[in-house]
Amino acid sequence: MAKLTAVPLSALVDEPVHIRVTGLTPFQVVCLQASLKDDKGNLFNSQAFYRASEVGEVDLERDSSLGGDYMGVHPMGLFWSMKPEKLLTRLVKRDVMNRPHKVHIKLCHPYFPVEGKVISSSLDSLILERWYVAPGVTRIHVKEGRIRGALFLPPGEGPFPGVIDLFGGAGGLFEFRASLLASHGFATLALAYWGYDDLPSRLEKVDLEYFEEGVEFLLRHPKVLGPGVGILSVCIGAEIGLSMAINLKQITATVLINGPNFVSSNPHVYRGKVFQPTPCSEEFVTTNALGLVEFYRTFEETADKDSKYCFPIEKAHGHFLFVVGEDDKNLNSKVHAKQAIAQLMKSGKKNWTLLSYPGAGHLIEPPYSPLCSASRMPFVIPSINWGGEVIPHAAAQEHSWKEIQKFLKQHLNPGFNSQL
């Protein structure tokens, strides 16, 4: 009798799962399916076909998928190859504290669609819990002064290295990365800056003094290890993160995921100074064959050619980790990172590391997250192409997440000796 097993049944989302099947007939072909519903009820699913060994077993750590949503030996392929049933939907975990993703794994006979319906009998099934928060992590709702967000603290007395987590142009408050970082020992502030609570409904300017308040708030907490803090940032959040690293002396480690090295669209304001956006070439905004907008060429005639538009990154005192998806269709991230590095090198600085991933897109998330290659965005019509190829993007997410943690611990905790 066929038996499906997975170890562990409950784990953090960035932890691998070992999936095996036993009790099959020799060389039997079976289908493995995975599905989950997000907090809004949107369905995501994947499937892969496997041939059993001569002893009737399938082991995803050893055996190659014959087809389906991926091919080859990929132990976590059922997770990162999931696709949304509703097109242009990004998998975002909103309730990180109380509910895990429940992933249904189903073992069944190979099936053939009949009149649009899937005809397949189940041989076995199980449910996995995938958490964004480890036991003992606490969440504190933050509404202090102008600051709005959520602070996640690891279990224990601390003090812990402090990190500010910044997302990009979607607005609102994203907590899933901060809660996961806290699960790995970082006191992490998920900081909203527009489209949340009583913050502005649209991002019209970047007030760096607001983010400075966020830094000071974090450093005041008794469980946060000073004297500096780190930044984990993506897209427009990375633009802000870079600006913070240059202007705020408390920033000692900055992770920039697919961000520009210049002011892209909204002016930055700090202590009376205004940093104006870089001119863009709207004629280079393109729409691909699927009707998705691509912005990555819009600064070809300005920032990509002339360093006068670039942030003076050489003035920063901290360290930088650039994470680049070379198939990013939203920003020319590889060019922007190389420009910033060239400025640092010209000033004789070696305070940078570059991770550049061929085939990875714009939205580089924690490990095993499904690739979101396109989605809807507030105030942007039509939808945006983020880029990325499924398998190399998944590899980039797994590798970069480990490197991000190493980098932050190295530069925020002087006594850290990498064991990752």
Curated annotation (Swiss-Prot):
Its main location: other. Its EC number is 2.3.1.65, 3.1.2.27, 3.1.2.2. It is found in: Peroxisome; Cytoplasm, Cytosol. Pfam families: BAAT_C (PF08840), Bile_Hydr_Trans (PF04775). It catalyses: choloyl-CoA + glycine = glycocholate + CoA + H(+); hexadecanoyl-CoA + H2O = hexadecanoate + CoA + H(+); choloyl-CoA + H2O = cholate + CoA + H(+); chenodeoxycholoyl-CoA + H2O = chenodeoxycholate + CoA + H(+). GO terms for cellular component: cytosol; peroxisome. Gene3D superfamilies: Acyl-CoA thioester hydrolase/BAAT N-terminal domain, alpha/beta hydrolase. The modification Phosphoserine is found at S125, S418. Belongs to the C/M/P thioester hydrolase family. Catalyzes the amidation of bile acids (BAs) with the amino acids taurine and glycine. More efficient at taurine conjugation of cholyl CoA than glycine conjugation. Amidation of BAs in the liver with glycine or taurine prior to their excretion into bile is an important biochemical event in bile acid metabolism. This conjugation (or amidation) plays several important biological roles in that it promotes the secretion of BAs and cholesterol into bile and increases the detergent properties of BAs in the intestine, which facilitates lipid and vitamin absorption. This is Bile acid-CoA:amino acid N-acyltransferase.
